[in-house]
């Protein structure tokens, strides 16, 4: 029965999608069966969609035949978000259009633009794309936003949720909505009143529960990308704003993101970084807390296992804090460095505090930080998981 549904779906999409953009052969299905992670699911059909109209029709037909759909942009996810054993819709190449507002403070992006490319576009205007995951040179906007991939510098103050202004989406039944367009909102409100009423009902239910509302605020004051994003129900009154921000971190489970308008951030032209070494992790953590009110833009803690994984020879059992400061002028940068040194004066560092403003030097520090995840993973002893050894798992088998 299921096979018949896929065959019927294939027949119908063949009427508007060229054959060279539909993959059903064994070899290519195998190739598309994995992303950057180590999971594998073999899709039944892979479709390279060209535009929003095609996606809308593809989803409407999938809804008609009750067939699951997964979306993929670059496929740099590590947790299997962009693999499928059903229908895989790819929106990478040909989804690279963008527009910038006259004041350069907003940028509208299609999902197939690589994050680093967005920064290249904005750099001449002194602006940047705030989310900066380690995979920013490969990850595309669609995946960055839908996975709420934040990265090393944007923290929670400038992640996708904070930067998003509006979204153009396609719902599971093929319905299109642009939350930033009054006409689209009006049409959606007219045709989907019960849907909007349900959003409002959930919003009010959450807000009327003070304990739950406080817990949500607390959870999202720190990095939190687990599960669906509940913060919009607490923050926004307008149901369309709630819908737009629900997309962030939804991993494509709620809708297809065909376009997103986001705030841009000021790009400081001068920066300096230092690798600060402490004899123990407690001192390192205390130093991070002390630096928080200062002109510190990022402080990344690298524990002894992380340092060992990249063959750091400074010492054994140390903890490092990779620290960065930025400024608009060289004078401001030097003043920032001196202020940070003053803040750290009560702390004993293993090596003298040395900030470098040379890109060829500090880029090596950040390259180390970006590569920590696979480096640490490579040191894991075979037969172990991140928490429990396989032998212990077997001991509890029934």
Listing of model-derived features with the role each one plays in the protein:
Residues 19-26, 72, 129-133, 206-227, ...:
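Flexible, glycine/charged-enriched surface loops at secondary-structure junctions
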Residues 97-100, 107-111, 115-288, 293:
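FAD-binding subdomain of flavoenzyme oxidoreductases
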Residues 63-68, 96, 124-129, 236-237, ...:
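Secondary-structure transition/capping motifs at alpha-helix termini
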Residues 391-398:
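Conserved small/polar residues in nucleotide/adenosyl-binding loops
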Residues 152, 156, 162-165, 278-280, ...:
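Phosphate/diphosphate-binding loops
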Residues 1-60, 64, 74-105, 134, ...:
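N-terminal flexible segment immediately upstream of the FAD-binding catalytic core
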Residues 8-19, 57, 61-65, 121, ...:
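Generic non-transmembrane alpha-helical segments
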């Amino acid at each position: 029965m299921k096979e018949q549904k896929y065959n019927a779906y294939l027949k119908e999409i063949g009427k508007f999608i060229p054959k060279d953009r539909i993959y059903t052969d064994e070899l290519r299905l195998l190739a598309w069966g994995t992303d950057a992670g180590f999971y594998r699911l073999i899709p039944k059909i892979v479709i390279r969609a060209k535009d929003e109209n095609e996606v809308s029709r593809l989803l409407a037909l999938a809804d008609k035949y009750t067939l699951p759909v997964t979306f993929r942009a670059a496929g740099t996810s590590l947790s299997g978000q962009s693999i499928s054993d059903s229908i895989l819709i790819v929106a990478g190449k040909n989804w690279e259009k963008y527009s910038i507002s006259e004041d350069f403070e907003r940028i509208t992006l299609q999902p197939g633009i690589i994050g680093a490319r967005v920064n290249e576009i904005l750099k001449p205007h002194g602006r940047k794309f705030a989310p900066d995951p380690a995979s920013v040179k490969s990850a595309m906007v669609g995946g960055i936003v839908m996975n709420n991939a934040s990265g090393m510098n944007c923290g929670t103050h400038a992640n996708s949720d904070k930067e998003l202004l509006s979204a153009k989406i396609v719902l599971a039944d093929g319905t299109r909505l642009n939350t930033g367009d009054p006409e689209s909102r009006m049409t959606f409100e007219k045709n989907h009143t019960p849907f909007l009423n349900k959003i409002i009902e959930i919003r009010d239910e959450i807000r009327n529960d003070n304990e739950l509302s406080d817990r949500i605020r607390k959870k999202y004051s720190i990095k939190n990308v687990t599960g669906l994003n509940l913060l919009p129900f607490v923050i926004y009154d307008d149901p369309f704003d709630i819908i737009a921000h629900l997309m962030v971190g939804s991993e494509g489970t709620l809708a297809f993101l065909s376009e997103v308008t986001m705030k841009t951030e000021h790009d400081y032209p001068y920066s300096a970084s230092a690798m600060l070494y402490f004899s123990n992790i407690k001192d390192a953590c205390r130093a991070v807390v002390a630096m928080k009110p200062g002109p510190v833009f990022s402080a990344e803690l690298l524990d002894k296992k992380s340092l060992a994984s990249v063959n750091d020879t400074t010492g054994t059992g140390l903890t490092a804090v990779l620290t960065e400061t930025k400024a608009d002028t060289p004078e401001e940068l030097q003043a920032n460095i001196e202020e940070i040194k003053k803040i750290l004066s009560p702390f004993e560092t293993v090596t003298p505090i040395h900030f470098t403003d040379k890109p060829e030097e500090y880029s090596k520090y950040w390259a180390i930080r970006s590569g920590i995840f696979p480096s640490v993973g490579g040191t894991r002893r075979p037969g172990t998981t991140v928490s429990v050894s396989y032998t212990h798992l077997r001991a509890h088998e029934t």
